[in-house]
């Protein structure tokens, strides 16, 4: 019994350490961009560099884990914004727009991931580039099954991502984001705006 308790405790500690490293790595990457080092992440996470390597192996594996984590968090946020009472085409696309327009930490993280210049150098890592392509393809596939035309999906999706990118660099305030989200939700509903522009 004592060894089982110790094993559970050790697993929890490993999970906490992993979470701390992922959170710290995200913050350091946003600050340092592709020049991020394992030493910087280890310092920010409060772990030794050897401890970080134990969990992630090397820098590329850490970066890949960060990107995977941010995508998982964002997918969860999109699903939280899914309105099950909307029984008409575009339900998932509207949830995507709401999630990108939300102010949650996870939404901001994915806006940073998908939009911030500081991440661009990370896409040179083959596994990261493949994951980004895979995620884009998966979103496209799910949106295509959502009942709207491909053209409408493209316009709404890319506009929402653009608004999110502008928010990251400070070009949009909360009011303008809310206005844009409202217009995009209208466009993802029946293709028309409720009020004149």
Language-model region placement:
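Hydrophobic alpha-helical connector segments
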Residues: 76-114, 181
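Helix-turn-helix
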Residues: 20, 24, 28-61, 65
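Hydrophobic/aromatic-rich alpha-helical bundle segments in the mid-to-C-terminal region
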Residues: 105-108, 126-197
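Solvent-exposed, amphipathic alpha-helical segments
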Residues: 24-31, 77-80, 159-166
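Alpha-helical DNA-contacting segments of helix-turn-helix folds
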Residues: 63-70, 77
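Amphipathic, non-transmembrane alpha-helical scaffold segments
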Residues: 14, 67, 71, 129-136
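Generic transmembrane alpha-helix motif of multi-pass integral membrane proteins
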Residues: 115-122
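N-terminal intrinsically disordered/low-complexity leader segments
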Residues: 1-16, 195-197
């Amino acid at each position: 019994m004592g060894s089982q308790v110790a094993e559970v405790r050790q697993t929890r500690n490993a999970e906490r350490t992993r979470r701390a490293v992922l959170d710290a790595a995200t913050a350091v990457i946003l600050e340092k961009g592709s020049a991020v080092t394992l030493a910087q992440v280890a310092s920010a996470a409060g772990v030794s560099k050897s401890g970080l390597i134990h969990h992630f192996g090397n820098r590329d594996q850490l970066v890949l884990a960060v990107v995977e984590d941010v995508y998982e968090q964002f997918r969860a946020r999109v699903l939280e914004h899914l309105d099950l009472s909307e029984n008409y085409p575009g339900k998932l696309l509207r949830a995507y727009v709401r999630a990108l327009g939300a102010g949650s930490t996870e939404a901001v993280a994915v806006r940073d991931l998908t939009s911030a210049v500081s991440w661009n150098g990370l896409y040179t890592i083959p596994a990261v580039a493949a994951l980004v392509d895979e995620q884009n393809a998966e979103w496209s596939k799910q949106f295509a099954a959502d009942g709207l035309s491909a053209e409408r999906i493209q316009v709404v999706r890319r506009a929402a991502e653009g608004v999110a990118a502008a928010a990251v660099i400070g070009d949009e305030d909360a009011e303008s984001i809310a206005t844009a989200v409202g217009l995009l939700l209208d466009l993802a509903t029946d293709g028309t705006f409720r009020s004149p522009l």
